[in-house]
Amino acid sequence: MKIIIVGCGKVGYAIAQQLTQEKHDITVVDDEAAHLNRADSTLDVLCIHGNGASISVLMEAGARDADLVIAVTGVDETNLVCALIAKSMGAQHTIARVRNPEYRRDADMLKREIGLDMVINPDLAAAQEIARILSFPAAISVEPFAGGRIDMIGFQLHPEDTILGRSLSDFHRERVAEVLICAAQRGDEFIIPNGAFVPQLEDRLYMVGSKAELHKMLKSMGRSLQRVKDVSILGGSRISMYLSWELARAGTRVHVVEQDHDKCLRLSQDLPGAMIIEGDGTDIDLIKSENLFGADGFVALTGRDEENLLMALAARRAGVRKVLAKMTRPNYMELVQETGLGSIISPKDIIANQITRYVRALANSQGMAVESLYKLLGGKVEALEFTASNDGNGILHTPLMKLPLRHGVLLAAIVREGRTIIPGGMTTIEPGDHVLVVTNVPGLTDLKNILA
């Protein structure tokens, strides 16, 4: 597919990086030479210097015959104008990054009037992911599938976990809960486990099931299921505002610490139910006087990775039960994994995953296309959701044990008429099923791709 990305900052670069790996024809447009130099030296893309909302620049980029134009500059209005012009020039599909909460309320109208196919908001997406993780305190990541009927959670193994030292086949035979362990990370090794796999201390495991069954399994492992009732948020960013709204709906008490006076005033107006604290969130005296580390949860959301990392580690050492930090630099994210800090949030990667899913669905509009996509274990493994249709010749009505599945493909769960099925050898795929596939095979676009 011919794809134009307007804006090559952190978000645009992450999108370009993923889509070039998918072997698409990518053109990036930016008015900052430094952004283009980075893309030109590290990615297989065509770079064009200029304003992405300019007709002449879009024409030079080839918007007239583009399959998709993605506008992700730092200015909402520029993105909307770019998408409008590109669509009028002949681009088949357009996506715009829109961060302003006021525009968010008008998203449906914007899609209709401007012809947008998709509106993305990295800040809102990050806030929603943080809220999901806070609702599952034992997990370091939570990803919903099948409209929220099933979740995939990631968690680090602790010495007290009852699953340690036992094969998965032995563990699952007990049928404590209808769940499936579908992926694992051990050091630098990424594993799609079979029944002989034996979990070890410090392994990171990924498990699939309904919320109720996952809770049942975690409880059987000795994990605490106590709800996070109050959260301290460091930084008064847009993500903080969206997160505060999400947490307020769940009845969670929120404290937001922000140093900028004007931001504090805006936050106090937008978040009447939250406690807004003006001050330096890294100041030990402030932390003690406001008891910020006395909360059940701590979320570091400043614009500086270093500050987020240091404060998250301090919160962990102080005994805060659930700690999360926003990170943008890949090298920092690797460092954090080594510290065992746990939950790391990367807004740019969340959005890149969403757009990759959308692009794969466009590339396979006639078949059983990807409906959800989640990259785990550093992108080495993917979890994909498909809906089976009558086009699935060779896959439907056949017991899984008789299907010639590709090596590295695992069918983790099926949702049929609202009921979650953890598949066994005699399970079949039927039309209308939501099928969750976990694989280390890159670039699957159709459910049929699971066959060898």
How would you name each of these model-derived features?
Residues M1-A452:
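Cytosolic regulatory regions of ion transport systems
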